A protein has these predicted regions:
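Short amphipathic beta-strand starts and helix->beta connectors
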Residues: 3, 222-237
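A structural signal for short secondary-structure junctions
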Residues: 141, 189-192, 221-222, 240-246
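A conserved helix-loop-beta module that forms one wall/lid of the active-site cleft
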Residues: 1-18
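Short amphipathic alpha-helical segments
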Residues: 16-18, 196, 244-250
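Generic C-terminus detector
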Residues: 232-236, 242-258
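Short beta-strand/turn micro-motifs at beta-sheet edges
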Residues: 83-85, 185-187, 232-240
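Active-site "cap" helix and flanking loop/linker of ATP-utilizing ligase/carboxylase catalytic domains
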Residues: 112-134, 152-222, 235
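Internal nucleotide-binding/catalytic subdomain
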Residues: 11, 18-161
Length: 258
């Protein structure tokens, strides 16, 4: 009845790998079968959600709120598909950049007015005022309208790795102001730099992959470079080895994306 493409999602937490976009009805049936019968996502896929497929530009809004005031961090866009050219399965994120070139102050005000403030008002009306981080995954449709694809109450990965380096204020002071209910007085300058991050993943991710491979890292002292560890650990000999699907995020900071 829904037609294709559609979106099939696991109803539980699946480390960013629980969303599928089948192009045909047959693929949709196959994915549902793998999740419900073969339990490819374990308990996370015990129940599924079927959603409309929405076209447009997807982006991430990270914001801090003390329950009354919202402060939006620099915009970001992550890339979830495993392969180049926006191909392959969805992942927890294979890379990101910040800020998004086509996002301006007018757009941010629109997000605050249309998405964030109504959300906070709704929470207050439900008797659950919220203080903390809001992650809104937003699709900007070709006509400029907004669809909220997901909400989280945490920073994103890899979005945080590119947003925080270009954030012009003191993030610790911002969190402190949030906890004190004084966020309305917290200001910071516009980003003057851009950040681009690329995830280094284990072969086979997000499907079956092996771990325990020894790795070495060079370039940690390069100016304008950050290397964030994720799926790494030390073996009994003290060697750095892989321990997960997404192993490292390498971030470069510069004056422009070019």
């Amino acid at each position: 009845q829904q037609g294709a493409p559609i979106v099939v999602k696991a109803d539980g937490l699946a480390a960013g790998k629980g969303a599928f976009i089948p192009e045909t009805r047959e693929d949709a049936v196959s994915i549902c079968s793998m999740m419900l019968e073969n339990m490819i996502l374990g308990p996370a896929g015990k129940n599924i959600i079927i959603e409309d497929y929405v076209e447009g530009q997807e982006m991430t809004i990270l914001a801090i709120t003390d329950g009354e005031t919202v402060r939006i961090l620099p915009s970001s866009q992550d890339h979830k598909r495993a392969l180049d050219g926006d191909k392959g399965n969805n992942t927890g994120g294979m890379g990101a950049y910040s800020p998004v070139p086509w996002v301006d102050d007018e757009f941010m005000h629109k997000v605050e007015k249309v998405v964030l403030m109504p959300t906070l008002e709704g929470l207050r009306n439900e008797g659950i005022p919220f203080c903390g981080v809001i992650y809104a995954g937003i699709m900007v449709k070709p006509d400029g309208s907004l669809s909220v694809l997901e909400y989280n109450v945490r920073l994103g990965d890899p979005e945080a790795q590119v947003v925080l380096p270009v954030f012009g204020g003191d993030f610790g002071e911002m969190i402190l102001a949030c906890c004190k209910g004084e966020l309305s007085g917290f200001k910071w300058p516009e980003p003057e730099r851009v950040a681009l991050g690329v995830v280094m993943a284990s072969g086979g991710y997000p499907e079956k992959y092996d771990t325990g491979f020894e790795i070495s890292i060079r370039g940690e002292d390069l100016p304008g470079t950050f290397i964030y560890h994720a799926g790494t650990s030390s073996d009994c000999g003290g060697n750095l080895v892989t321990s997960g699907g997404r192993v490292l995020t390498v971030v470069g900071i510069a004056g422009s994306l070019r």
